[in-house]
Amino acid sequence: MTNFTVIIPARFASSRLPGKPLADIAGKPMIIHVLEKARLSGATRVVVATDNEEVKQAVEQFGGEVCMTSAKHNSGTERLAEVVETLNIPDDEIIVNIQGDEPLIPPVIVSQVAENLCKFKVNMASLAVKIHESAELFNPNAVKVLTDKDGYVLYFSRAPIPWNRDAFARLNSGELKQEELDLADHYLRHIGIYAYRAGFIKQYVQWEPSALEQIESLEQLRVLWYGEKIHVELAKEIPAVGVDTAEDLEKVRAILSNF
């Protein structure tokens, strides 16, 4: 069993759903559901990183560990770097980053991504699932990932990759409908969970943001831009919806109300 620390960034001032870490789901704040899933993963330590006193109080009330961070970070990775520095986490320690809006994340994939990092000797590891619906393929909020034959990432994009020249031309001409598109096993959706060594997180934030990450608004592209490898494997369990919008929140509430 691989030892790892989970850090959960929980930003209070979400643009689409302000205050969402404290949104009530089945009688508990959302961040507590994420915390409980992380604890079930076998992590040796779980830390919530937040810039908000109310979130801090909620987590501590449930016996969780909190690290207060600046409200001025531009990304979740910058928040992680502050936690690593503040808590003096050793450079070789494995950090798993779980988003604070994933109350339904399966614990098994949290440990899986840590194992993936160790198994392939890379600086960063993540997970993906197969895309079976054409609507998801063309949805820019569903990030696509393209890998080589061994699972090393070639690129992440909000666009459909690889681009099926002939089939997509038929789509544009009206000869083919989206629902008739044969997706086979060519398309993968990236899951926003990462594992890295603490020292690599500190290295990452020293790099200047890349043109590609700014165009796509995907911070993981910075890693590829600077020549580092990311390994992705298929998740052992497909995670349910995360909470980005009020509609997502209602879906999650409906799911957890049955438990």
From Swiss-Prot:
<dbReference type="GO" id="GO:0009103">
    <property type="term" value="P:lipopolysaccharide biosynthetic process"/>
</dbReference>
<dbReference type="GO" id="GO:0008690">
    <property type="term" value="F:3-deoxy-manno-octulosonate cytidylyltransferase activity"/>
</dbReference>
<keyword id="KW-0448">Lipopolysaccharide biosynthesis</keyword>
<dbReference type="InterPro" id="IPR003329">
    <property type="entry name" value="Cytidylyl_trans"/>
</dbReference>
<comment type="similarity">
    <text>Belongs to the KdsB family.</text>
</comment>
<comment type="pathway">
    <text>Bacterial outer membrane biogenesis; lipopolysaccharide biosynthesis.</text>
</comment>
<dbReference type="InterPro" id="IPR029044">
    <property type="entry name" value="Nucleotide-diphossugar_trans"/>
</dbReference>
<keyword id="KW-0808">Transferase</keyword>
<dbReference type="GO" id="GO:0005829">
    <property type="term" value="C:cytosol"/>
</dbReference>
<comment type="function">
    <text>Activates KDO (a required 8-carbon sugar) for incorporation into bacterial lipopolysaccharide in Gram-negative bacteria.</text>
</comment>
<keyword id="KW-0548">Nucleotidyltransferase</keyword>
<keyword id="KW-0963">Cytoplasm</keyword>
<dbReference type="InterPro" id="IPR004528">
    <property type="entry name" value="KdsB"/>
</dbReference>
<protein>
    <recommendedName>
        <fullName>3-deoxy-manno-octulosonate cytidylyltransferase</fullName>
        <ecNumber>2.7.7.38</ecNumber>
    </recommendedName>
</protein>
<dbReference type="Pfam" id="PF02348">
    <property type="entry name" value="CTP_transf_3"/>
</dbReference>
<comment type="pathway">
    <text>Nucleotide-sugar biosynthesis; CMP-3-deoxy-D-manno-octulosonate biosynthesis; CMP-3-deoxy-D-manno-octulosonate from 3-deoxy-D-manno-octulosonate and CTP: step 1/1.</text>
</comment>
<dbReference type="GO" id="GO:0033468">
    <property type="term" value="P:CMP-keto-3-deoxy-D-manno-octulosonic acid biosynthetic process"/>
</dbReference>
